[in-house]
Amino acid sequence: MAIKQVIVVRTDLDMGKGKIAAQVGHACVLGAEHVRKSNPEWFSEWWVGQEKVVLKVANLKELEQVKQDAIELNIPWSEVTDAGHTQIAPGTTTCISIGPAPEESIDKITGDLKLL
């Protein structure tokens, strides 16, 4: 079974490249740690290659829909909210991590999204 992690980033926030990289990094760590605790088998299989894909959505509404779809399919997710020290307001949701989880399950949610 192929296991991957997908990070979905909002593009409406006009974050700089460095800011996006930092937020994606936060999402990767949060998602991996969540799955390490909740599903060690998936985590162990994912850990070998650590497949990650970064996708984009246009706004918070689309991001919330991806999150809701993950909840409905019982796929682990983690949300990143910014501290507000630099480019965006405190508490702004910037991205989410879906998985690490089985690729086929994640693709049901994110298969139509575009690469960042």
Regions found by a protein language model. Name each.
Residues M1-Q5, Q68-E72:
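Acidic-glycine-rich active-site phosphate/pyrophosphate-binding loop
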Residues A2-S38:
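Glycine- and Gly-Pro-enriched alpha-helical subdomains that act as flexible
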Residues I7-V8, V48-A58, E72-L116:
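Short basic, glycine-rich beta-strand/loop surfaces that mediate nucleic-acid
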Residues G18-I20, V66, P90:
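Short, well-ordered secondary-structure micro-motifs
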Residues G25, E33-K61:
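Compact, glycine-rich, soluble single-domain proteins
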